[in-house]
């Protein structure tokens, strides 16, 4: 069945893992203490600081929360509060021009081609929806956000859980079998397949020097870049 809708991951799929790990994460880690001190009383920030404080044992100083968040960055923890606060920090960095978001060079032309062909594109990433919009809006290929019909993050559920994809299918409103999910993570693709979606394993040599073929692909169609995706 030919897909009618595309659902894509970002890190390791449209964009280099190294950009996130070597640029965005260190930027947020360094900025966290000052950001929390300056913006900690703003409702959109306070909400997440209080959530972290509750998780680590109740009332505690914001400086301790900031240290905890820095530790979570070091652990690459996929925590919704951390992702939300990182997104707010990255917003400042993007708008100041401190960096632009990396996209592999073939991605933007392919996305534009799908858009012109009438194929809706949705994004599902562990990064918060505001961070996703910044990533596409301030990319090194220009503003790609008009190509995206909708955004999903871990507030809808974890990316390795089939129910998350079932909820996304309901939100998009087309049969699961008509949606193709693009990701570099086999376990995410497994969950999407369990929910009835089509899948493609994005296996970029820059991010995965050892090609994942045979058993390593676990039955998912493997491509090395977006130009190889046949829809």
From Swiss-Prot:
Signal peptide feature range: none
Pathway, per record: Amino-acid biosynthesis; L-methionine biosynthesis via salvage pathway; L-methionine from S-methyl-5-thio-alpha-D-ribose 1-phosphate: step 3/6; Amino-acid biosynthesis; L-methionine biosynthesis via salvage pathway; L-methionine from S-methyl-5-thio-alpha-D-ribose 1-phosphate: step 4/6
BP-aspect Gene Ontology terms: L-methionine salvage from methylthioadenosine
One Pfam family linked to the record: Hydrolase
EC numbers for this chain: 3.1.3.77
Keyword Metal-binding carried by entry: yes
CDD domains, per the entry: HAD_EP (cd01629)
Reactions accelerated catalytically: 5-methylsulfanyl-2,3-dioxopentyl phosphate + H2O = 1,2-dihydroxy-5-(methylsulfanyl)pent-1-en-3-one + phosphate
Name assigned to this protein: Enolase-phosphatase E1
Gene designation: mtnC
């Amino acid at each position: 069945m030919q897909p009618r809708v595309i659902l894509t991951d970002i890190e390791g799929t449209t964009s280099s893992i190294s950009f996130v790990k070597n640029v965005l994460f260190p930027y947020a880690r360094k900025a966290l203490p000052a950001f929390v001190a300056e913006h900690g009383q703003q409702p959109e920030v306070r909400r997440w600081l209080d959530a972290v404080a509750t998780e680590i044992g109740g009332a505690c100083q914001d400086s301790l929360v900031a240290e905890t968040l820095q530790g979570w960055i070091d652990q690459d923890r996929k925590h919704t509060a951390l992702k939300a606060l990182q997104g707010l920090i990255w917003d400042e960095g993007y708008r100041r021009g401190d960096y632009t978001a990396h996209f592999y060079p073939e991605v933007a032309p392919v996305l534009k081609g799908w858009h012109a062909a009438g194929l809706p594109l949705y994004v599902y990433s562990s990064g918060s929806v505001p961070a996703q919009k910044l990533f596409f809006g301030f990319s090194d290929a220009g503003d790609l956000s008009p190509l995206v019909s909708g955004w999903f993050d871990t507030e809808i559920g974890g990316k390795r859980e089939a129910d998350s994809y079932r909820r996304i299918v309901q939100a998009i409103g087309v049969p699961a079998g008509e949606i193709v999910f693009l990701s570099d993570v086999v376990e995410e693709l497994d969950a999407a397949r369990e929910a009835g979606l089509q899948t493609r394993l994005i296996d970029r040599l820059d991010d995965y020097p050892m090609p994942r073929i045979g058993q390593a692909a676990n039955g998912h169609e493997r491509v090395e870049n977006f130009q190889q995706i046949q829809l």
